[in-house]
Amino acid sequence: MEALVYTFLLVSTLGIIFFAIFFREPPKVPTKGGK
């Protein structure tokens, strides 16, 4: 059970870091319905 909890925490942490870096940098790909 503990392994599952630690795995979930690890994945969630990596996901948050990934999204933080992704949204911090300006998107190079132009959005189809963007401004």
Curated annotation (Swiss-Prot):
Keywords: Chloroplast, Membrane, Photosynthesis, Photosystem II, Plastid, Thylakoid, Transmembrane, Transmembrane helix. It holds the Pfam family PsbT. Its main location: plastid. The keyword Plastid applies. GO terms for biological process: photosynthesis. Disulfide bonds: none annotated. The chain crosses the membrane at residues 3-23. Found at the monomer-monomer interface of the photosystem II (PS II) dimer, plays a role in assembly and dimerization of PSII. PSII is a light-driven water plastoquinone oxidoreductase, using light energy to abstract electrons from H(2)O, generating a proton gradient subsequently used for ATP formation. This is Photosystem II reaction center protein T. The lineage of its organism: Eukaryota, Viridiplantae, Streptophyta, Embryophyta, Tracheophyta.
